[in-house]
Amino acid sequence: SALDPEMVGEVLELMKDLAKEGMTMVVVTHEMGFAREVASRVLFIDDGQIKEEAAPAEFFEHPKDPRLQEFLSKIL
């Protein structure tokens, strides 16, 4: 859900700490920097369908799906 902008950093830091401790999380986010840093797998969902799934390095450096390429070009 949307967070108070003043709380986003604090919540993301807590989630990073939990991930470092080995907690498994399923996170839906537009915070791509966070996903790149914390995730072991990243999925791109478009129109209710999984369009791409990869390790963060592959996902961000070599996206295959045209919609994902477009999305990343606009936000990174």
Residue ranges and their predicted role:
Residues 5-7:
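Helix N-cap at the start of a conserved alpha-helix in ABC-type nucleotide-binding domains
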Residues 35-37:
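A short, surface-exposed alpha-helical micro-motif characterized by mixed small hydrophobic
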